Regions:
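Low-complexity, Pro/Thr/Ser/Gly/Ala-rich linker/spacer regions in secreted
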Residues: 72, 76-95, 474-487
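Structural signature of tandem-repeat unit edges
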Residues: 90-98, 116-124, 141-154, 166-189, ...
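Short, T/G/N/S-enriched strand-turn elements that build extracellular solenoid repeat scaffolds
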Residues: 102-111, 127-136, 160, 193, ...
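Consensus positions within tandem repeat domains that build extended binding/scaffold surfaces
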Residues: 159, 191-194, 214-217, 240-242, ...
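Residue-level detector of functionally pivotal "anchor" positions at catalytic/ligand-binding pockets or at interdomain
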Residues: 476-504
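C-terminal tail/sorting-segment detector
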Residues: 513-528
Length: 528
């Protein structure tokens, strides 16, 4: 019997924010249920009365609920060791046909606790899903084939195979033995927490009829390895934590043109390596792909809503990301700790780079900031150790505290602004954009050349934050960005006006960047 310490489960599920406890304590069943439910849903739940999330006893088939917990637990996995893959030599399967929903317990009888595989034909409802769960928890059931079943309303109910009220016993949470389930066509929705903590589940299929996967549906399915994971046309919403901590979920995810929303933490800490983002995608939630293993990301829809932060943070393998030119800001902690990212060009319409957006991108060597950028927030580029040169545009107005700290290899800084950008100061630590008392030695060097417009050096020297530097050099010869990353034929680029996506245009707009006669030009009036 697999037994997992409940608090260890909580630690694994929230490792990014929790600290590891050195000791454990047993808790009452009621307290454990409360903590489990709060962890799974993020909400407080009163277990003194039914919340409606866990089935009431009157929905449980009498033949199942009559047995007491101790007896039923003793029946679980008599043919297995703790390894769910070690099955007995002669597995038993059963083929059952129902004529009406709610009949499954009657049809299978005591065999529900003795079969390894179950094929279900005919209509099934929430009560039947309880019967299926019972066989996976109290019995031997590990494979369920619903290919020819008719799920009433096309919905797998909430908490179908995760029932904390019964799985948490004496402060421990017991997992179920389900290894594979085959879903039928006609399935539209997989309900909230339906397979939460089904940690032996390895294989699922996605029917062409599926439209939505609700929150935490497959959270903590550590062994799930369906590859590729293909969502059908008509699928619209992947809710928060849907595949959170599915650490064996590797390979490709294919999204349909119909998808509208990817919720917070949807693929958090999974190991998927590639995904497409259709143009119709409208929203990507907080930490949706944090900890994945993408090498390249391409986003084309400029109107995506970025909810929360760190949508692609901690993607250790990420080497390239392309964003639409029309993006107006980079979300907070958007690419933090993407340690293989070496080269990045901020989209031309970006005005604000939010806090921590590129924090600890240690190998970022080349960074192109757009003309028109106005603000770089706190810690936006902190610990980008590989940077050797940066050009702050003339439009820059504000630098956040610690936004440029620990640039240990920086050789030169260019600031094109005639008015020295305001440097924010952390009132608690005293940190400025280029200095922090927490800097690792040697931090950002203060004796490198800082190039500023002619006639402004004294102004920079007397500005809090900029006074960190000792070597200001006045110049009117600032470096210009190359156009190698714009897909325009060389001859054509010298004969017309193009936007930053390489599309030929006839007119320009004030405040945007264009390629004019082969050079990037920031338009501060409508003279072209």
């Amino acid at each position: 019997m697999k037994k997992v310490l409940f608090y260890l489960l909580l630690f694994i599920c929230s490792f990014s924010t929790a600290t590891f406890a050195q000791s454990y304590r047993r808790v009452s069943e009621k307290e454990a249920l409360y903590i489990a439910q709060k962890q799974f849903t993020g909400k407080d739940v009163d277990y003194s009365t039914s919340s409606g999330i866990i089935p009431e006893n009157d929905t449980i088939p009498l033949s199942i609920r009559q047995a007491d917990v101790a007896n039923r637990l003793s029946m679980r996995y008599p043919f297995r060791s703790n390894n769910a893959d070690e099955v007995r030599e002669q597995p038993v399967y059963l083929n059952v046909t129902t004529t009406a929903a709610g009949q499954l317990a009657e049809k299978v009888g005591d065999d529900i606790n003795n079969v390894d595989s179950l094929i279900v034909n005919g209509p099934i409802n929430d009560t039947d899903f309880y019967t299926l769960w019972s066989g996976t928890f109290y019995g031997r059931l590990s494979v369920i084939n619903l290919e020819n079943a008719e799920i009433i309303n096309g919905v797998i109910p909430e908490w179908a195979f995760c029932r904390p009220k019964e799985q948490v016993i004496d402060g421990y949470i017991y997992s179920i033995g389900l290894r594979r389930i085959i879903f039928p066509e006609g399935l539209k929705v997989i309900g909230k927490s339906a397979f939460n903590f089904v940690d032996n589940l390895k294989y699922i299929n996605i029917p062409t009829s599926l439209q939505r996967i609700e929150s935490s549906a497959f959270t903590l399915c550590w062994l799930l390895k369906t590859n590729p994971l293909v969502f059908p046309e008509g699928f619209e919403k992947l809710e928060e934590r849907a595949f959170m901590n599915c650490s064996e979920l590797k390979g490709s995810v294919v999204l349909p043109s119909t998808i509208k929303e990817i919720g917070a933490l949807a693929f958090y800490s999974s190991k998927i390596t590639s995904i497409n983002f259709p143009e119709g995608l409208e929203e990507i939630g907080n930490e949706a792909f944090r900890g994945c293993r993408f090498k390249e990301v391409v986003i084309s829809n400029p109107n995506i809503i970025w909810s929360g932060e760190s949508q692609f943070g901690y993607n250790f393998k990420l080497e390239k990301i392309s964003l639409p030119e029309e993006m107006t800001y980079i979300p907070p902690r958007f690419l933090e700790y993407c340690i293989e990212l070496k080269d990045f060009r901020i989209p031309s319409d970006v005005k604000v780079i939010k806090s921590g957006a590129f924090n600890e991108c240690y190998n970022l060597q080349k960074l192109e900031l757009p003309a028109g950028l106005e603000e770089i927030e706190d810690q936006a580029f902190s610990k980008c150790n590989a940077l050797e040169e940066i050009v702050f545009p003339a439009s820059l107005k504000t630098l956040g505290a610690e936004s440029c700290t620990n640039w240990t290899n920086i050789k030169r800084i260019y600031s094109m602004a005639a008015e020295s950008p305001v440097c924010k100061v952390n009132m608690n630590s005293g940190a400025t954009p280029f200095y922090s008392p927490n800097d690792s030695d040697p931090g950002t060097p203060n004796d490198i050349p800082v190039y500023v417009p002619t006639g402004t050096a004294e102004k920079y020297r007397n500005t809090k934050g900029w006074d960190y530097f000792t070597n200001f050099i006045e110049t009117d010869d600032f470096p210009t960005s190359t156009i190698n990353d714009i897909n325009i034929e060389q001859q054509e680029s010298k004969q017309g006006i193009y936007d930053m996506s390489g599309r030929k245009v006839t007119t320009t707009e004030k405040g945007k960047v264009y390629i004019i006669n082969g050079k990037k030009v920031f338009i501060d009036n409508n003279s072209h």
